[in-house]
Every structure is written in C-alpha cells, then in structure tokens.
C-alpha cells in the first residue's frame, strides 16, 4: 500500500538522518478525469501516516511533479493533510508543465517549502498556444535570477538544489483548443495570464541538435557543470 511504502521511506530517512522524505502525487497524466480525486487519496494516505512520520521526527516534502499539480492545488493538499508534518519540495521547472508561472508557484508555496529542485526554462508563444523547454541554468527566460532572490528571501535556510534537465524538443501546450482546458477547468484566468506574460517575453529556443560524437552521459555532465558554474557565480554576487 501507499502507507507501507511511505513507512519504508520514513525508516530509510531515519537511518541516513534525513529530516525529510520526498514524495510525489504523479504526473500530468493524472489530471485526466480530474486531479482532485488523486489529491484526496494522497491526503488520506498522509493522514493515515501522520503518527509514523511525526514519531520519526521527519517531514514529508511533496513535489510539484511532472505536470501534476498547480501551486494552489498543492497548497490545498498540504493544508488538508497537516502542515505540521507535510511540506513542499518546490521544483522551478515543473510549473511550466502546468501552464503556471514559476514565480507564482514560489509565492504560493514559500511558507511550506522544505527543500528545492531548481532548473531554468524557456517559454514562448506558438500559433497553437505555447511551447516550453527546460534549459541550463541562466539560459532560459523565466527570470531565474529573480526566482532565486525570492527563494532565498522567503525560504531562508532552505537548500538551493539543482535538478538539471535540459530538454530536447519543447513541450507544446495547444491552449487554443477548447479540449485542452478539460485538464485545467479550475485554473483562474489571472493565473494563466501570468504564464502568458512569460511566454510573451520569450522567443523560440530549440535545442541544438545532439552531436553524435558526444555521448549522452558527456552531454549531461556538461549541462550540470555549466549550471553549477552559473549558479555559483550568481550566488556569489548576492
């Protein structure tokens, strides 16, 4: 069961002396048919596990993961489960997979943040809607500098943790198709407008064709090294 799996992770956290256990609801596929029922199920699992988690002296950090929840939905989950033992692993890249401005995500979830995943994103308009692509740190147009400044101010003492994923082809969001909105029926217009503002600032930034002479491992290493270098240089200026 989900409770048994979480219990095993809590035991593992105690062994390695981790103060948190990261967990996820699912992915964007779980929005089909309504994300609400999955949120309710996760709240039930967390409530059933409350004593186990609190007795261990750890907290559960729920990630906004792979297009599953928008910020207001994850905030509601944390509040319903109990913020005394449930918080957030905030990912700066995943909001764009839910047509959400990452800065709005941070503003909404900052009080609950336990740790982070950070990577940059490029967003731009297309005839059908919008395109998004994850990039090396500093190479996107989402405003990573301001994001980190806000994170440090609103989440003092929390880790700046890089999760470097550089996309190949962009992910397309054809929001001009009425059927698209079946997945986002509860999204307020003002929230979506903030996402569009980021798209308006962008321009198409397709990924460079992979060099067949470079292995995927070497390419990933180069992405990580470039992202770490940029982040260290930026943090040194603060």
Model-predicted regions and their roles:
Residues 22, 52, 94, 117-120:
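Positively charged, amphipathic and often flexible ligand-engagement surfaces
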Residues 25-29, 66-68, 92-94, 122, ...:
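Active-site-proximal loop/turn and secondary-structure-junction residues that shape catalytic pockets
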Residues 33-35, 59, 91, 132-133, ...:
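A short, structure-level motif marking secondary-structure boundaries and short turns
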Residues 62-63, 90-91, 119, 162:
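Active-site flanking residues adjacent to catalytic metal/cofactor-binding acidic residues
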Residues 1-88:
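Active-site acidic/histidine proton-transfer and metal-coordination neighborhood
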Residues 71-85, 96-238:
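Histidine-acidic metal/acid-base catalytic patches
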């Amino acid at each position: 069961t989900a409770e048994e799996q979480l219990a095993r992770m809590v035991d593992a956290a105690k062994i390695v002396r981790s103060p948190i256990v990261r967990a996820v609801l699912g992915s964007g596929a779980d929005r089909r048919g309504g994300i609400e029922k999955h949120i309710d199920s996760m709240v039930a699992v967390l409530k059933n596990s409350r004593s186990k988690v609190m007795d261990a002296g750890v907290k559960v950090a729920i990630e906004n993961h792979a297009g599953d929840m928008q910020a207001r939905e994850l905030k509601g989950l944390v509040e319903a489960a109990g913020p005394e033992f449930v918080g957030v692993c905030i990912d700066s890249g995943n909001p764009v997979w839910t047509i959400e401005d990452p800065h709005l995500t941070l503003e909404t979830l900052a009080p609950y943040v336990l740790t982070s995943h950070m990577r940059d994103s490029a967003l731009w308009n297309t005839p059908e809607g919008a395109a998004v692509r994850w990039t090396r740190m500093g190479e996107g147009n989402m405003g990573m500098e301001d994001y980190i400044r806000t994170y440090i101010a609103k989440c003092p003492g929390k880790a700046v943790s890089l999760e470097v994923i550089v996309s190949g082809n962009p992910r397309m969001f054809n929001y001009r198709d009425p059927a698209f909105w079946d997945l986002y029926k509860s999204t307020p217009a003002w929230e979506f407008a903030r996402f569009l503002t980021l798209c308006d600032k962008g321009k198409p930034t397709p990924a460079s064709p992979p060099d067949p002479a470079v292995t995927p491992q070497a390419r990933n290493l180069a992405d990580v090294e470039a992202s770490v270098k940029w982040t260290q240089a930026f943090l040194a200026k603060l």
